């Protein structure tokens, strides 16, 4: 009986599941992006032409009318390309990117800062300190150091 109910629901709803929706925007080539961290909104509904993301599954480019999806972000650089061609880069420590119908992209991250705000000397010293802490007998200190190392190595690669 339960299987029959599921089959009837599946048959009646199949027509609407999996339908791709497109934006009904004034400019179909514009992607509206929001980049937010818990302590600040870096920008909200900024109109751009493309955003490149450091997804956990690999680098990902997002344009207007992209298929809706949710992606986990790895530590890396979010590149925002405006319609004029100018690009701004932000380092994110991780988070999620939600690509929504209507050519909208919402990026939620724990930390996000302009890439040019970092100096390679500071990164090297922080990385050396984290590597020392990684061999700590205290499991909490070692686990935190492992996370720091992952983020700092990604930051170091992005700055160079």
Swiss-Prot record:
<protein>
    <recommendedName>
        <fullName>ATP synthase subunit delta, mitochondrial</fullName>
    </recommendedName>
</protein>
<dbReference type="GO" id="GO:0005743">
    <property type="term" value="C:mitochondrial inner membrane"/>
</dbReference>
<keyword id="KW-0472">Membrane</keyword>
<keyword id="KW-0139">CF(1)</keyword>
<comment type="subunit">
    <text>F-type ATP synthases have 2 components, the catalytic core F(1) and the membrane-embedded component F(0), linked together by a central stalk and a peripheral stalk. The central stalk, also called rotor shaft, is often seen as part of F(1). The peripheral stalk is seen as part of F(0). F(0) contains the membrane channel next to the rotor. F-type ATP synthases form dimers but each monomer functions independently in ATP generation.</text>
</comment>
<feature type="transit peptide" description="Mitochondrion">
    <location>
        <begin position="1"/>
        <end position="22"/>
    </location>
</feature>
<keyword id="KW-0496">Mitochondrion</keyword>
<comment type="function">
    <text>Mitochondrial membrane ATP synthase (F(1)F(0) ATP synthase or Complex V) produces ATP from ADP in the presence of a proton gradient across the membrane which is generated by electron transport complexes of the respiratory chain. F-type ATP synthases consist of two structural domains, F(1) - containing the extramembraneous catalytic core, and F(0) - containing the membrane proton channel, linked together by a central stalk and a peripheral stalk.</text>
</comment>
<dbReference type="InterPro" id="IPR048938">
    <property type="entry name" value="ATPD_C_fung"/>
</dbReference>
<dbReference type="InterPro" id="IPR020546">
    <property type="entry name" value="ATP_synth_F1_dsu/esu_N"/>
</dbReference>
<dbReference type="Pfam" id="PF21334">
    <property type="entry name" value="ATPD_C_fung"/>
</dbReference>
<keyword id="KW-0813">Transport</keyword>
<keyword id="KW-0809">Transit peptide</keyword>
<dbReference type="InterPro" id="IPR001469">
    <property type="entry name" value="ATP_synth_F1_dsu/esu"/>
</dbReference>
<dbReference type="InterPro" id="IPR036771">
    <property type="entry name" value="ATPsynth_dsu/esu_N"/>
</dbReference>
<keyword id="KW-0066">ATP synthesis</keyword>
<keyword id="KW-0999">Mitochondrion inner membrane</keyword>
<dbReference type="Pfam" id="PF02823">
    <property type="entry name" value="ATP-synt_DE_N"/>
</dbReference>
<dbReference type="GO" id="GO:0045259">
    <property type="term" value="C:proton-transporting ATP synthase complex"/>
</dbReference>
<keyword id="KW-0406">Ion transport</keyword>
<comment type="similarity">
    <text>Belongs to the ATPase epsilon chain family.</text>
</comment>
<keyword id="KW-0375">Hydrogen ion transport</keyword>
<dbReference type="GO" id="GO:0046933">
    <property type="term" value="F:proton-transporting ATP synthase activity, rotational mechanism"/>
</dbReference>
């Amino acid at each position: 009986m339960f299987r029959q109910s599921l089959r009837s629901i599946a048959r009646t709803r199949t027509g609407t599941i999996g339908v791709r929706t497109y934006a009904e925007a004034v400019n179909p080539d514009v992607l509206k992006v929001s980049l937010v961290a818990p302590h600040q909104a870096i920008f909200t509904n900024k109109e751009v032409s493309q955003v490149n993301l450091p997804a956990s599954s690999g680098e990902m480019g997002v344009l207007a009318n992209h298929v809706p999806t949710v992606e986990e972000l790895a530590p890396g650089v979010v590149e925002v390309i405006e319609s004029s061609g100018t690009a701004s880069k932000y380092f994110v420590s991780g988070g999620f990117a939600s690509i929504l119908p209507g050519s909208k992209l919402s990026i939620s991250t724990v930390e996000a800062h302009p890439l040019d705000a970092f100096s390679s000397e500071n990164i090297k010293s922080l990385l050396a300190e984290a590597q020392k802490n990684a061999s700590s007998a205290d499991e909490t200190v070692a686990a935190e150091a492992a996370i720091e190392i992952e983020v700092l190595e990604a930051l170091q690669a992005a700055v160079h």
